[in-house]
Amino acid sequence: MPVAHVALPVPLPRTFDYLLPEGMTVKAGCRVRVPFGKQQERIGIVVSVSDASELPLNELKAVVEVLDSEPVFTHSVWRLLLWAADYYHHPIGDVLFHALPILLRQGRPAANAPMWYWFATEQGQAVDLNSLKRSPKQQQALAALRQGKIWRDQVATLEFNDAALQALRKKGLCDLASETPEFSDWRTNYAVSGERLRLNTEQATAVGAIHSAADTFSAWLLAGVTGSGKTEVYLSVLENVLAQGKQALVMVPEIGLTPQTIARFRERFNAPVEVLHSGLNDSERLSAWLKAKNGEAAIVIGTRSALFTPFKNLGVIVIDEEHDSSYKQQEGWRYHARDLAVYRAHSEQIPIILGSATPALETLCNVQQKKYRLLRLTRRAGNARPAIQHVLDLKGQKVQAGLAPALITRMRQHLQADNQVILFLNRRGFAPALLCHDCGWIAECPRCDHYYTLHQAQHHLRCHHCDSQRPVPRQCPSCGSTHLVPVGLGTEQLEQTLAPLFPGVPISRIDRDTTSRKGALEQQLAEVHRGGARILIGTQMLAKGHHFPDVTLVALLDVDGALFSADFRSAERFAQLYTQVAGRAGRAGKQGEVVLQTHHPEHPLLQTLLYKGYDAFAEQALAERRMMQLPPWTSHVIVRAEDHNNQHAPLFLQQLRNLILSSPLADEKLWVLGPVPALAPKRGGRWRWQILLQHPSRVRLQHIINGTLALINTIPDSRKVKWVLDVDPIEG
């Protein structure tokens, strides 16, 4: 009897075997309903079908129901998901279900759902409306129904309610019916509807190069300075793709930040543009997903998880702001959407465009190795003038709310000229260091030349590279000052302390806390554009693609947090943030200014960025990473473990380290650091520790991990901790 090997959404790296009853057939990629646990049925996805099982056949339960006649995934997405589960060492069931809309996970049909509507019956058309005058809601409802059908999901917006319609139904005056939406083929009347901008020479060259390779895999880095017209290149490439009857996937870092982008695509093309993001309800998400799969959607714009959308005939993938860290999932299945998008493009044999003003070092490394091709856009639209740059030395300055006196003076000047000011504060990813405010001394580990991380709760300094520790000094060993401060300031604290400095000036704080509610970001941005807010306080969210014509002063307040972080990636993140931020000032014919506050104005990173630009920084950083044998020249895997008592996690990781180093696959090129506390050592009441594995060969490191995972359950403490694997981590 055939055996179905079924993936279930459980945290176990295996499939489960079920018998297929006589007469029941199923294909890999189809959903089934199966018994699981005590008196419980679950939805599963068939990974394969065979005639054998590791268990005796008489011990296997049978599949209850097959939900699909054809796989819910296209062939290319199926291959992508199976490969990704293996590469990221994540349970196959969790991976497959992550890629499905919630309603499909729950067993809903993978087809356009019938759309229900109310209509007036023959009796309802003939009855005297005055007979309902004692029930005004019913009278209103029937009068409306006589004008035509009313869709069920529209009732909530009307003057009457569902109860009135149900009452009319009991009287035989109205009823419910349904119809399945017909497929509409946009290809029959496709045309470019919006206004085309004339491409400059660089843009035209880029579009032509990509078009010439349209029928095979090619990866293109579109490196364009802020305001150089990358979106116009995307639009022109999509014109060519849609003209061939193919579809396009456009991925963006934060869907809430790009209402302008969506509008530009919808205005440009006389074809359906669907949007996939976390703000959609379940029905909207399923509808967009199905339209992409059946070819009804010409363009899908979405965030990270949109990568797994099935397409009938995909012709190109665009990754906008490809350097953005939000493409990396940080919880659960820790995949990187940019990297998987390249795999998908290769599998589908189509071009992929990676666009950025500040490309990731991994992407630039692939360009150096001839895996990707480089296209440059160097001219800003309208020949806008670059912002004037200032570095303010904070040493010995009496700061207010984290602002130097010179910055406060500049802010007043710009505000008096009826302009707007942005203050950037970006703690995320920058580990706190200990700094002397008077002389600029930074607490540094003597064993490995990295900066100590300040642990406030334990009141000690700890090196996250070699694990050496020391108490927090009472005074600066360089100048004797007792003014030792942790680097960093919070946006909320800044907002509160700015108010008395600028009385009567409207202040708007834009960060994760203030924009979590649906529509909150759009509302705040509209207020900014109306001039309702004069001072904007924000994190890196504000650096992503917004155009603020009245912003003429931009200041970065916590530069030192990036310069002296324990995370080797923080310099790259800061360089990207600074370059993006500098493009926010003075974009509408007004001269812009950018101010950086630091205790170390002579720092080489600042000097390179200010006077040579991001490209020079990236070249220098890649050379340094190569010399230090850090990614992208080597591969990293982090194993994190956590517990409630701060005992089992480090013990488990030490046992795991011993297991790895004793493996016959481990060679002299494998480097293992730890166990050390995670950069955020305590979260949610749990203590977090980690070990880092590094190897110059990605393939070899994968083999080592595979061999280790097969034996991990032999470690005594493995069941006393929660542990996760992070392949190609982007945070220390």
UniProtKB/Swiss-Prot annotation:
Disruption phenotype: Cells are filamentous and grow slowly with low viability, chromosomes can be fragmented, partitions nucleoids poorly, increased sensitivity to UV light and mitomycin C, does not allow phage phiX1874 replication. Loss of inducible stable DNA replication (iSDR, seen in SOS-induced cells), and constitutive stable DNA replication (cSDR, seen in rnhA mutants); neither type of DNA replication requires protein synthesis, DnaA or oriC. ColE1-type plasmids are not replicated. Defective in homologous recombination, hypersensitive to mitomycin C and gamma rays. Residues 633-732 are annotated as: CTD. Changing residue 476 to G: Normal ATPase activity, 8 to 10-fold reduced helicase activity, 7-fold less primer synthesis, helicase and primer synthesis partially restored by Zn(2+). Induction: Induced by hydroxyurea. Residues 115-174 are annotated as: WH. GO terms for molecular function: 3'-5' DNA helicase activity; ATP binding; ATP hydrolysis activity; DNA binding; helicase activity; zinc ion binding. Zn(2+) 1 binds at residues 436, 439, 476, 479. It is an enzyme of class 5 (isomerase). Binds ssDNA as a monomer. Binds to replication forks, subsequently PriB then DnaT bind in a 'hand-off' mechanism, which allows DnaC to load helicase DnaB onto the fork. Forms a branched DNA-PriA-PriB complex when the lagging strand is single-stranded (ss)DNA. Component of the replication restart primosome, which is composed of PriA, PriB, PriC, DnaB and DnaT; DnaG primase associates transiently with this complex. There may be 2 PriA subunits per (pre)primosome. Interacts with single-stranded binding protein (SSB). Interacts with PriB; binding is improved in the presence of ssDNA. This is Replication restart protein PriA. It comes from Escherichia coli (strain K12).
